[in-house]
Swiss-Prot record:
Lineage top rank: taxon: Eukaryota
Keywords: Cardiotoxin, Cytolysis, Disulfide bond, Membrane, Secreted, Signal, Target cell membrane, Target membrane, Toxin
Tissues where the protein occurs: Expressed by the venom gland.
Protein name in UniProt: Cytotoxin 3d
Taxonomic lineage of the native organism: Eukaryota, Metazoa, Chordata, Craniata, Vertebrata
Keyword flag Cell membrane: no
A biological process term (GO) from this entry: killing of cells of another organism
Amino acid sequence: MKTLLLTLVVVTIVCLDLGYTLKCNKLIPIASKTCPAGKNLCYKMFMVATPKVPVKRGCIDVCPKNSLLVKYVCCNTDRCN
């Protein structure tokens, strides 16, 4: 009985994923990094003239505004950038 109870507790902790943190791609999409506390968005920055080639990727707290030369795409799920 104790083994069953202990198993249920362990499964519950694993399923809750305590301390969840966001993971965002770095510039090279194969590599990702865990975002620090407070950085709850992933972003991808690219030049408007070359929209298929990202210049920068990472974690950010607030999505920056686009300009005439630079565009930002932000999202909030793991490796969405």
